[in-house]
């Protein structure tokens, strides 16, 4: 026992033969030699398996761990390890193997173990202790094996975010193929279907196509004739085609008419936005047209070959007049429906009208220049055209901008005020605390109304009455707040209570200043009685000099109490000791502070200053 447990004992080293070996029977020595050979073969086999194990995948390693574990148990059981030489040659085979403990490293392969002669042939206590150690080793091995299996399962079944994101992106790409913004579900196929079903959009697309072809021809032909008027009219028409293309896109997208997670109110605002941008584009064109006209007034250009210029401008004028008449008629038809389509078509007709005016200006300037040689006629007509554009486009920009800014519609302000007055006189209504009215698109009004009502108010009846009164609102949200309902709030502060007591019996004035600071975070309850009677002498226990004055701002002159109700003597200054020597009387003053059954979420730190004037 002492040999094994000593510091010099080495289980991996075979000790020298000593006296105990001479007592062994030759057969026992032969058995021991066979056991050593088996151990050496086992070590070589494990070393070979280790090299193969490291080349396998994690699932195969996990499977081999289990197979190696079973082989180790069977081999240890068959080799006769774990014997207990308590008496005679009895053997006890169980789960505790002293000869071959199954220790594995992090990768799961078995480690060699060499038992000595003393370890194999010692007393029962030694064998039992070895068995206990092997029990611990076997337990550690099982834990390590379970951890390895768990880690392998995690590695094999772990969530791969990159694969998930790729699959999700593929699904989104399939759903939103050729999507305009990538997330709204507006595809080219959807736009083509709307174009096929919308007669206004179909005619606008046809007109834009014809006008675009003619505009490109006008630009190149004007450059060939060196006519600045034709080139300017061509670029002006090109910008108008771009603006009308925006209006066409707004018409097609706004036709969708349904909502989703991205556009919870639907797509009506697309057409509003397109109309607003189109009006702003008209103002931009009129501004530069005005600048160009001023420049041509100062330096009139010389136009060559007025006949060809007039013929090309006449063709452009005819196309524009047809477009103005058509879209103006459509705008009047839609105006009766109070829809944004009317505003959009009106803006388009203004675009075409501007093109018609510019074409007419080119024709008139060519006639005047050819007949009278007056070159400034083109510039004068261009200024008139710019003023007409501003007159028509500015109200459209103001109206659509008001919708985008969610202002209250002007035509509904009177109805809204009358409705609010009627709601205030309804049964159970105390006040209208908040109200919002705005237009999502022309003819689509949205509103939210918050009311303060009485406690016994019938919410359902009141809500139905309000909805009937605000029937002109398409999307109405009503919130009712009961009377006496307060929102939770937190408060804090410092209170200063000055008290001054004057006594007639004695010329003795007392002024008490109470300063209470509140710091939240503690709850306290107690019963504090302070009584001041006649000839009340206050005596304070002297404080040892080694105590230091407290520097905390929360210190006070009251006695603090531990959790076990033990009073703690507080610190006092020298001035307090001098004040304690004075005897003062308090007549007819009784202060009673009762804090029973009140739990406050704060602690009171009070400082009382006493000034005595004798």
UniProtKB/Swiss-Prot annotation:
What family is this?
A: Belongs to the cation diffusion facilitator (CDF) transporter (TC 2.A.4) family. SLC30A subfamily.
Q: Where is the composition biased (Acidic residues)?
A: 575-585
Give ranges for the Cytoplasmic compartment: 1-203, 255-270, 328-351, 399-614
Q: Tell me the membrane topology, using the record's own terms.
A: Multi-pass membrane protein
Q: Where is the composition biased (Low complexity)?
A: 17-64, 121-176
Named from the GO MF annotations, one term is:
zinc ion transmembrane transporter activity
Q: Which residue intervals are annotated with compositional bias (Basic and acidic residues) in the record?
A: 525-535, 586-599
Q: What does this protein do?
A: May be involved in zinc transport from the cytoplasm to either intracellular organelles or extracellular spaces.
**What spans are recorded as compositionally biased (Basic residues)?**
80-92, 487-499, 507-523, 600-614
Entry's localization field: Membrane
Keywords, in A-Z order: Ion transport, Membrane, Metal-binding, Transmembrane, Transmembrane helix, Transport, Zinc, Zinc transport
Q: What is this protein called?
A: Probable zinc transporter protein DDB_G0269332
Naturally occurring in which organism (per UniProt): Dictyostelium discoideum (Social amoeba)
Q: List all topological domains (Extracellular).
A: 225-233, 292-306, 373-377
The GO annotation for biological process reads: intracellular zinc ion homeostasis; zinc ion import into Golgi lumen
Show the segment(s) annotated as Disordered: 1-103, 115-178, 483-614
Entries under Gene3D superfamilies matching the protein: Cation efflux protein transmembrane domain
Record's compositionally biased regions (Polar residues): 548-567
What residue intervals traverse the membrane? Answer: 204-224, 234-254, 271-291, 307-327, 352-372, 378-398
Name the predominant localization. Answer: membrane
Parts forming coiled coils: none
Q: Do you know which PANTHER family this protein is assigned to?
A: PTHR45755, ZINC TRANSPORTER PROTEIN DDB_G0269332-RELATED
């Amino acid at each position: 026992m002492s040999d094994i447990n000593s510091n010099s004992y080495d289980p991996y080293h075979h000790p020298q033969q000593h006296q105990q070996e001479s007592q062994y029977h030759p057969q026992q020595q032969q058995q021991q030699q066979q056991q050593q050979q088996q151990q050496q073969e086992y070590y070589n086999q494990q070393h070979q398996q280790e090299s193969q194990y490291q080349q396998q995948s994690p699932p195969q390693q996990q499977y081999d761990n289990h197979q190696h574990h079973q082989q180790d148990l069977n081999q240890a059981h068959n080799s006769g390890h774990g014997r207990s030489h308590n008496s005679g040659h009895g053997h006890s085979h169980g789960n505790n193997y002293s000869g071959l403990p199954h220790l594995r490293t992090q990768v799961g392969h078995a480690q060699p173990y060499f038992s000595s002669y003393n370890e194999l042939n010692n007393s029962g206590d030694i064998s039992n202790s070895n068995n206990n150690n092997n029990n611990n080793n076997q337990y550690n091995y099982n834990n390590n094996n379970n951890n390895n299996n768990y880690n392998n399962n995690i590695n094999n079944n772990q969530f791969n975010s990159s694969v998930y994101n790729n699959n999700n992106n593929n699904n989104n790409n399939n759903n939103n193929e050729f999507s305009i913004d990538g997330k709204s579900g507006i595809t080219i196929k959807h736009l083509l279907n709307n174009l096929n079903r919308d007669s206004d959009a179909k005619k606008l697309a046809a007109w834009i196509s014809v006008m675009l072809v003619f505009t490109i021809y006008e630009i190149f032909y004007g450059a060939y004739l060196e006519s600045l008027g034709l080139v300017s009219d061509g670029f002006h028409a090109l910008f108008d085609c771009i603006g009308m293309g925006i209006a066409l896109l707004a018409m097609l997208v706004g036709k969708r008419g349904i909502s989703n997670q991205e556009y919870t109110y639907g797509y009506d605002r697309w057409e509003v936005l397109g109309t607003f941008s189109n009006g702003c584009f008209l103002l931009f064109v009129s501004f530069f047209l005005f600048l160009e006209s001023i420049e041509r007034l100062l330096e009139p250009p010389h136009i060559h070959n007025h006949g060809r210029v007039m013929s090309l401008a006449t063709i452009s004028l005819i196309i524009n007049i047809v477009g103005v008449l058509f879209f103006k008629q459509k705008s009047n038809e839609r105006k009766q429906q109070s829809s944004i389509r009317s505003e959009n078509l009106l803006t388009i007709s203004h675009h075409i009208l501007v093109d018609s005016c510019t074409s007419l200006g080119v024709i008139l300037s060519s006639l005047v220049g050819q007949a009278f040689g007056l070159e400034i006629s083109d510039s004068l007509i261009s200024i008139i055209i710019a003023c007409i554009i501003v007159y028509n486009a500015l109200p459209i920009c103001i109206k659509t901008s008001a919708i985008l800014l969610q202002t209250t519609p002007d035509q509904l302000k009177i109805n809204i005020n009358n409705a609010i007055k009627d709601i205030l006189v309804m049964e159970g209504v105390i006040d209208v605390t908040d109200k919002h009215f705005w237009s999502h698109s022309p003819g689509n009004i949205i509103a939210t109304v918050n009311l303060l009502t009485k406690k016994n108010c019938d919410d359902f009846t009141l809500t139905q009455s309000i909805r009937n009164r605000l029937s002109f609102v398409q999307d109405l949200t009503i919130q009712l707040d009961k009377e006496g309902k307060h929102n939770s709030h937190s408060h804090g502060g410092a209170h200063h209570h000055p008290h001054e007591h004057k006594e007639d019996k004695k010329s003795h004035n007392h002024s008490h200043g109470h300063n209470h600071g509140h710091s939240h975070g503690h709850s306290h309850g107690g019963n504090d009685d302070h009584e001041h009677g006649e000839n009340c002498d206050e005596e304070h226990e002297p404080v040892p000099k080694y105590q230091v004055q407290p520097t905390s701002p929360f210190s006070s002159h009251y006695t603090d109490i531990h959790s076990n109700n033990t009073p703690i003597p507080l610190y006092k200054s020298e001035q307090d000791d001098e004040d304690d020597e004075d005897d003062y009387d308090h007549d007819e003053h009784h202060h009673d502070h009762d804090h029973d059954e009140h739990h406050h979420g704060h602690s009171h730190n009070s400082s009382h200053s006493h000034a005595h004037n004798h």
